[in-house]
Amino acid sequence: MCASLNEVKKNDTYGVSQKGYNDNFSESEGVLHGSKSMPTSMKNMLQSPTMVNMCDILQNKEAANDEKPVIPTTDTATAGTGTEDISSTQSEETDQNSHLIASEILEGTFKDVSYKEYANFLGNDNNNQVLTEFVKLLSPLPSSLLETLFNLSKSIYFIAEAQNIDRILECLSKEWIACHPNTHWKSGYKSCHIVLFSLLILNSDLHNNFQVDHKKIKFSMVAFINNTLRALREENEYEELKIYSREHLIIEELSEYYKTLNETPLPLCTESRTSINTSDNQSSLKRFSTLGSREFSTSNLRSVNSNSTTLYSRDGQVSVREMSAKSNKNFHNNHPMDALYLKESFDDGLITENGSSWFMDDLILISKKSLPRKYSKRDKDQVAAPKTTSKRNKSFFGWLKPSKTTTLIEHASRRTSLSYLNKDSEWERVKIQVKEGRIFIFKIKPDVKDIIQSSETDSATIDYFKDISSSYFAYSLLEAEAHVVQDNIIIGSGAMKSNVCNKNTKRKSGNFTVSFPENINGPKLVLEFQTRSVEEAHKFMDCINFWAGRISPVPLTQFEAVSNAEYGWSDKILTEHASLNLKNIVVSEWKPLLGLELLYEDAKDVEMVELKERLKELMNFTRQLGIWIDKHNEIKDKLVEIWSFDDNYFEAVMNNWNSRYLYMNNQYKKRLSYLKALQKAMGSVQF
């Protein structure tokens, strides 16, 4: 029997039992059975003690829940009546009634139960037909499992009994597989179910205020991926369908999901279809439970019984900054700003051509959530969250391979606040100019009605927009990157008729994001904009990436610099490890170098080169980086062999290996964006 609610000493928002860093696992819990894709030496590995394992969370539910509310069922929606003489007419009426009820639940107008009990109603075993119809109304589902979960969370009040949440996720997984049969998940809906389940748990962990021993414990990305993979490998279909053969894609996918969910919590749908912020709704956090109830196939994944499952949204305010203090000071004081690029003869004819790669100017919208505060600098105390030491499963990194082409996980949610997906997002009018390596943002005052349309760049025009703006900013595009949201997000038109995203689809508005990298002044920042059309969003993206690629140095130093630190794969280790006492080796933590381009966003010391030369540099760099990624993967098996003698060493080296891989892969994708933008711009240049 699993522990009762009173026996669980430490529960998070879902009621998931939280383990301290020094908590011990039993021997049976500590063995990880490898899949066919594992090397023989990695068949039995100790699991990570730092995160609540999926196999701990999904315990076999044997105890009944005495406190669960009584949820009414509908006779017309009852599945499995056992009656064989039901006429086709009655069957059609049942289907129609189920569809009607599902539609009313989606609209929030179903009156038989409170909207807070919709999830319990749908998850009730007697209402399978209604649940099926409800999930169909959400189709076509996005190609991202996380975005699918976002759609579900904003469509229904997702606080319910554990087993009811579980049934909803299972049905959603089946529908997702039906919509996307040709992914690396193949027909494995159970595996998708596990991922959705894991994301739900991760959301609770990242965005609640639960503390253990006065410390706020958060799952690391590695721990999240490690434990999700462990649960996947326990599922029979993972091997039967050979899903493990694409595990490198799954690892990439999970890492992107972590980044997105870390920035943007799942919303909590209310009766008025508005999201609740944690700070304003602490009462909603009083109901605790654990996710999960069923046995996942024959793998005996278990869940701890509890009363209800709580999802909630937290005010995920982005850390704000002025991207360049010097630029903004000069901009606000009408002083000239330093040039960021080497001006060439062809620039004069293109620098004022609105709609080109050289210049974009328009009145558009910016997500209020991502809008920076007036004259604010980046919060110094939010540079980085403190890291916690952890012991990780050494099977986690087994088959990671680079993906140099666009994959299923290349969705914009990882770079955006997902305001596009939220009908309650607030937007502000802004005048945007992108030119000469910077983006200028003027936040228009709400009381200004008639705005003079002008794309001029003279001082009089700039002063006019300053006068009608409550705040304005000049951001350097050094190392920035833009993406069009609609390129990568598929939204079901039938999901919510009242949803803004469907209105966006009808009027064909566009959304694009601009990501600014982490630097010494603070963490990564993402701004989200909305344009009149997707075509205009693409033009902004091309212009931003063109200037970012033109002024951003190719980071060769990151890969060519020789360090005396040992990360676990030095030539001496790889060639002479048999004769070395490896226990005397000090393994340092691998981190990318902080280049001048991130220290000084307007630095004059950054080398300015001709456009042709920058294009050539990018072509050579992306080609070379692909070779470096391949070489980094080639040493993986060797590292496993060398460092398997000690868990601590193995963990440190594998963390280093993974960190460097992720850095290289992200750099590869960013430089490809730059390269494409520069190549497109070169088509309009005559030398």
From Swiss-Prot:
Membrane-topology annotation of the record: Peripheral membrane protein
Entry-annotated residues carrying Phosphoserine: 293, 299
Presence of keyword ATP-binding: no
InterPro entries: PH_GEF_YEL1, Sec7_C_sf, Sec7_dom, Sec7_dom_sf
Keyword Zinc: no
Comp. bias regions, Polar residues: 14-27
Stretches the record annotates as Disordered: 14-35, 63-97
Top-rank taxon: Eukaryota
Phosphothreonine: residues bearing it: 290
Cellular compartments per GO CC: cellular bud neck; cellular bud tip; cytoplasm; plasma membrane
Protein name: Guanine-nucleotide exchange factor YEL1
Protein species of origin: Saccharomyces cerevisiae (strain RM11-1a)
Record lineage: Eukaryota, Fungi, Dikarya, Ascomycota, Saccharomycotina
